[in-house]
Amino acid sequence: DANLILSSWRPVALEYSTFHDLHLEPRLVQSAQMSTEAEILQPPRDLEGPKSHPSWAVVNDAIDQDGQVLIFVGTRRSAQSEALKLSKRIEKRLKKEDPDRLKRLQDFASSLEGRSQTAMAERLAESIRGGVAFHHAGLTYGQRKAIEGAFKEGLLIGLTATPTLAAGVNLPARRVLVRDLKRWDDGMSRPLPVMEVRQMLGRAGRPKYDSFGEAWVLCKGTDGWGVADDVSERYFFGPVESISSKLASEPALRSHLLASVATGGFRHRGEIGDFFSATFLGASITKSQLNE
């Protein structure tokens, strides 16, 4: 007897934009309602920087505006590689413009490096010295918490991360860039679900600090304009995928069933049906399908 509640409200307005060949094209603004009106959208503009490294153009532009950037990539290796590349470029700029911040970054990096003498800790410290850190499940709990704290305090300029950050950590930034829209799955490269990309883009905009958030998607391909239109149509204006129960997978269902039996949760067969009929799976399929 539940009522469905829908809300498009956001504490900070969110501007969705496509980014290709250093050209930024705002497409949609989400606040109390969706809007594509020209007077609300920011005008298109071109960023300065090398076309071979568009992420740097995004971060460099954010530094000009005293902002921070979250960059989502497809793999842990990509997160580390991108962080190190950006770090080297930012370090050169900070040496000229903000040596005090560079010193604080170096002190923070040294403190992290001293806690754990591992190759991962060394790579993390190397990237932090230039104002960028990478964030993924391969880091220790202490490393992740230290990085998140430094980003929230404004010490770190950028953070490269895998999509797990979008699902599990409340870490907003003024600007979010989704660099990779595909990932390797079942032996082939597949596009990310709309739901997942929206989760990442939704990290843009810091309540109490920003008047709006910038949600950018990098569009790759020889026909940048065409790709950008397709990306906008799917990820900004397209419908979100339907939610399905993980218990619909036989291995997952079997695992939960055996665990419940082993821990004494079920005493007879009838209790099994009663339990699973009360789950999302039970609400999604017919009773006869559930019994089968």
Q: Could you tell me what each predicted segment is?
A:
Residues 13, 81-89, 146-149, 172, ...:
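Alpha-helical scaffold elements adjacent to nucleotide-binding pockets in ATP/GTP-utilizing enzyme cores
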Residues 1-87, 128, 133, 137, ...:
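Conserved interdomain linker/interface between the two RecA-like ATPase lobes of SF2 helicase motors
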Residues 142-151, 238-292:
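C-terminal accessory/connector segments of nucleic-acid motor ATPases
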Residues 171, 175-235:
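Conserved segment of the helicase C-terminal RecA-like domain
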Residues 144, 148, 152-180, 188, ...:
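Beta-edge loop/turn motif
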